[in-house]
């Protein structure tokens, strides 16, 4: 499962879901689904989010350790 820090970093930068969505060209609902882990974004969206949140993609998104699943 893909984990992320989008909500945390979005808030740190003072962006609403709508603000971030507008910056990267998606809907507010898309940001909500990504934050809840219900949608895995494309690499293009990952790169856009990382750019606007001033963080590397691997610090923003990571795969949940498979050992935690067992």
Can you annotate each of these PLM segments?
Residues 4-23:
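Short basic helix-loop element that most often maps to the first helix and adjoining turn
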Residues 6, 20-21, 31-34, 60:
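Conserved hydrophobic/aromatic packing and binding residues within compact polymer-binding modules
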Residues 17, 28, 46:
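Helix-turn-helix DNA-binding elements, focusing on the entry/boundary residues of the two helices
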Residues 26-39:
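Recognition helix of helix-turn-helix/homeodomain-like DNA-binding domains
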Residues 38-48, 67:
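Short, basic-rich loop-to-helix N-cap that marks the start of a DNA-contacting helix
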Residues 44-59:
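DNA major-groove recognition helix of helix-turn-helix/homeodomain DNA-binding modules
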Residues 51, 61-70:
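Short, charged recognition helix plus adjacent turn
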